[in-house]
Amino acid sequence: MEKPIRKLPRMKGFDYSQEDAYFVTICSYENKHIFGKISKINGVNNFLPSRIGEIVQDTFFRLPERFSEFELIHFSLLPNHLHFLVLKKDIDIQRKSSLSQFVGAFKSLSDRAVRNEMSIIKIWQKSFNDHIIRNEKDLQTHWLYIEENVNRWGEDEYFL
């Protein structure tokens, strides 16, 4: 039996180390709700992070210390996935990183930090989804999507 042809997650031929803005989604392993929960407070959905979620957030916000060419624009963590907007700047540094290296380092560092505190083997699915931001309107659309994500939690494709 032939193996199915796997769709490549990155755009073929695109240089992910060049200056650009990206919208990224990363899911938890097996889409488990391990990062926290959504709770209604005064009729409004709020995300309440678990200890794993706190570690993930802390790791994420410390990433620019390692990757000075990446600027975090917006971020939203939900029970089983996260979305973020990031700008890859073209600055003069010796070691230039791609979006995949940035995301890979984040997943590895957060995974290790979680394992140091608890006996969870895996917190992330393989790979990640990305969208290359094409213009200001596209950036605003994805910014708003992240901003309103917690309010749409019950309708979210990752709600499962």
Can you say where each PLM-predicted feature lies in the sequence?
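Short catalytic/metal-binding and nucleic-acid-binding patches
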Residues: M1-L160
